[in-house]
């Protein structure tokens, strides 16, 4: 079949290259992975006696995800099995945790918190049982109403999947370059 094969001038290796969304996750080494994929394509073409194609890929999430941080203002805090910190956002600005269980982390962003921590869940403002922004995270035990939580690595899908669910506004974007 190789003698009658169409010679592909270019092969797109696609996208979806992984990034670390939470502490303890490893980011993919994109140089190693893309080299491995390109070597596999080129060795297969050599074995079939075909010329090497131009190889492209789509690094969107790998570039954009770490570039976004979503800020939430803490509203109420309930101390139950684990502490629930209710924020002023939620599934309307990041549906991924509710839709398919995506996990994130959060950090106190507006001040230095106490050294003592509590296991917390960051919940959204919508009256939905699945409106959870962060399933479990260690936050300062002195977290209080008005504090700002930063949820990193939201650049890839947060804004593009956001909606006006329950007539909420889509959060503003602040673009920062270097310093």
Language-model features: where?
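Active-site loop/helix belt of alpha/beta enzymes
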Residues: 1-78, 166
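Charged (often Lys/Glu-rich) extended helix/loop segments that serve as interaction or gating elements
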Residues: 50-179
